């Protein structure tokens, strides 16, 4: 999978000494109402790549997008200034913020500068060739260390990589590609995928793509309700998409023909209303009443999934199986999370809700790999080529 040049290999060979290195990181972090960084995982994740280049004697430029500013019109709220400050603390050295950097940056070997929000540059999102060439002229080596934006062809993720003298993957991107390759290109069997979420329509292409590859396709959340409808089960007033039932049936059929299966819940946790104080009732799947809402899988189904997961060779996890924000509907997701933690198989997890579940149950250390990319992770699961990765592969060929 990872047939790309890597920053680690260049650093090892001594090729970075005295060179100008341009790192595209993903520093798109959330802020609280007071304008302070509320969660800095992405900034911390960027440090190893920056250190690698620094220690190899390079002059280092780092940039990232932050939010969705209007091109050519950055406001104070769009500035990477707080990120520069946090990066300075993490690196133990001053990281200067450079505005208006496209036409030239002064940076010395052993120094790190942060180039202001790249989405402020006119032409960034359209992958403009003129802008890409200007940015490529700033460096000797371009490094992409931002898996979270790998599915977007933009000037700092794609265009610059076409024209920079050398283009490579940073350690974060390298690890991500390796883990994803291990999970989908050459997986240890059995391969189990968990796809949760509210809508079949938004994840249909992923479900179809996985139906050709996996041994067990576990569906959760609103998606599972649509699959229950497809299996002829009552779902009351649960969230579902009746218009997607045919597509769900087709996925079940593809799996069946391959001797694989979509385990349909045999029991569920219902409530008459949706909320933190809703009373939870466990019912057999066939007994769901017209005014019931299914908000979690039942204990019998959860145990069956746990058995499947514990025996798995590889697990791909995207999405919870119930409304785990409310404790009375969290049991299914907790059982699944703990089974993944206890499984001897290799697990890879991605997507915002999934990361929240991993944090809630404290199983980060027992998850094989936690993907930093939301949309990029999903597009990879769909089997789509990621433009930022494809260009690095082309440059390495």
UniProtKB/Swiss-Prot annotation:
It is found in: Cytoplasm. Substrate binds at residues 26-28, 42, 65-68, 119, 152. It catalyses: (2R)-3-phosphoglycerate + ATP = (2R)-3-phospho-glyceroyl phosphate + ADP. GO terms for molecular function: ADP binding; ATP binding; phosphoglycerate kinase activity. SUPFAM superfamilies: Phosphoglycerate kinase (SSF53748). Belongs to the phosphoglycerate kinase family. This is Phosphoglycerate kinase. The gene is pgk.
């Amino acid at each position: 999978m990872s047939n790309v040049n890597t920053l680690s290999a260049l650093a090892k060979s001594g090729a970075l000494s005295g060179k100008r290195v341009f790192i595209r990181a993903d520093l798109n972090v959330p802020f609280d109402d007071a304008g302070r960084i509320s969660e800095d995982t992405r900034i911390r994740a960027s440090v190893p790549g920056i250190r690698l280049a620094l220690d190899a004697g390079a002059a280092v430029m780092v940039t990232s997008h932050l939010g969705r500013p209007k091109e050519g019109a950055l406001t104070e709220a769009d500035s990477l200034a707080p990120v520069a400050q946090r990066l300075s603390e993490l690196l133990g050295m001053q990281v200067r913020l450079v505005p208006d950097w496209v036409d030239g940056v002064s940076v010395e070997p052993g120094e790190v500068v942060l180039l202001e929000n790249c989405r402020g540059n006119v032409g960034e999102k359209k992958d403009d060739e003129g802008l890409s060439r200007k940015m490529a002229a700033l460096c000797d080596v371009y490094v992409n260390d931002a898996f979270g934006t790998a599915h977007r062809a933009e000037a700092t993720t794609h265009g610059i990589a076409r024209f920079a003298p050398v283009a490579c993957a940073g350690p974060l991107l390298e690890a991500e590609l390796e883990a994803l390759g291990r999970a989908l290109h050459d997986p240890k069997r059995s391969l189990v995928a968990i796809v949760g979420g509210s809508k079949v329509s938004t994840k249909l292409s992923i479900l179809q793509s996985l139906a050709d590859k996996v041994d067990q396709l576990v569906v959760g959340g609103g998606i599972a309700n649509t699959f229950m409808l497809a299996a002829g089960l009552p779902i009351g007033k649960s969230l579902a998409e009746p218009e997607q039932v045919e597509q769900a049936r087709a996925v079940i059929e593809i799996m069946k023909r391959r001797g694989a299966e979509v385990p349909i819940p045999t029991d569920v946790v219902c409530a008459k209303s949706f909320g933190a104080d809703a009373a939870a009732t466990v019912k057999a799947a066939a007994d769901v009443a017209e005014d019931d809402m299914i908000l979690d899988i039942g204990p019998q189904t959860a145990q069956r999934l746990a058995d499947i997961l514990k025996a798995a060779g590889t697990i791909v996890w995207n999405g919870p199986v119930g409304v785990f924000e409310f404790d009375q509907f969290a049991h299914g997701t907790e059982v699944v999370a703990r089974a993944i933690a206890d499984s001897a198989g290799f697990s890879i997890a991605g997507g915002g809700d999934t990361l929240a579940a991993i944090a809630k149950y404290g199983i980060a250390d027992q998850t094989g790999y936690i993907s930093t990319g939301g949309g990029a992770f999903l597009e990879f699961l769909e089997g789509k080529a990621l433009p930022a990765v494809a260009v690095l592969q082309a440059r390495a060929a």
